């Protein structure tokens, strides 16, 4: 009887070990799949600030298409400066890409985002990740008058407003400046012409009173753009293409 109980105990322990191993392998497979999908295909993202008003509001949630595969194809074609998006697109900026990140913390961050459904992250905080309006591509010449960007596309002889170059209409919030505020003061809403480099883009906030964009940072590298919101799924009252 003791031998039977001992054998049963060993068999039960073996089954439990296999069961635990299966659970671990399933979780590992889900984790790997999650990271592949998030890095190369799409992910969800929530807007936490009001810099893209009036079109986008804090709390809006989006499906974001990753820029990883288009960037990879551009490199394979040896055309690193080719931006896989258009003027007027809303894009996601990772302004922390220029920082060196600890390898262990990077792996830990991916685990944390996986097990919290991307609600918690070590790196992806409001001071790193932004949604901005892309208004100019590499090689473009840009200037600004009364908070409206004017763009001369690379290779073109004509200068157009940012709205004329956008596939979809949008309506930025234009601030009313005090009467005595002139061009010599900061953030006057005007900017002298600038020609972008071969790997540079120019992005702005839709709320033009919010200055955390290329007007302050300067042009950003193309690889800082990690994705593009293509669908707003929350709130339901404003569901659709952003």
Per-segment meaning from a language model:
Residues 2-21, 41, 46, 55-242:
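Soluble "head" domains of membrane/secretory-pathway proteins
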Residues 22-40:
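Hydrophobic membrane-insertion alpha-helices, especially the h-region
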């Amino acid at each position: 009887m003791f031998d039977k109980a001992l054998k049963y105990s060993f068999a039960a322990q073996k089954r439990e070990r296999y069961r635990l191993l299966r659970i671990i392998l399933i979780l590992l497979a889900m984790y790997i799949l999650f990271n592949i999908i998030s890095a190369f295909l799409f992910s969800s993202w929530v807007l936490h600030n009001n810099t893209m008003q009036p079109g986008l509001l804090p709390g809006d949630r989006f499906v974001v298409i990753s820029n990883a595969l288009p960037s990879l194809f551009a490199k394979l074609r040896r055309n690193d400066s080719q931006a896989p998006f258009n003027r007027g697109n809303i894009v996601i900026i990772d302004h922390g890409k220029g920082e060196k990140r600890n390898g262990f913390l990077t792996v830990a961050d991916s685990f944390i985002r996986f097990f919290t459904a991307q609600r918690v992250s070590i790196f992806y905080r409001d001071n790193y990740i932004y949604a901005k309006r892309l208004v100019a591509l590499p090689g473009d010449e840009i200037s600004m008058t009364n908070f409206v960007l004017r763009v001369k596309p690379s290779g073109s002889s004509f200068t157009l407003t940012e709205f004329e170059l956008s596939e979809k209409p949008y309506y930025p919030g234009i601030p009313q400046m005090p009467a005595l505020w002139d061009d010599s003061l900061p953030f006057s809403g005007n900017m002298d012409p600038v020609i972008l480099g071969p790997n540079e883009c120019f992005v702005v906030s839709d709320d033009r009173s919010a200055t955390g964009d290329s007007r302050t940072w300067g042009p950003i590298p193309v690889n800082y753009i990690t994705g593009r919101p293509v669908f707003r799924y929350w709130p339901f009252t404003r569901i659709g293409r952003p």
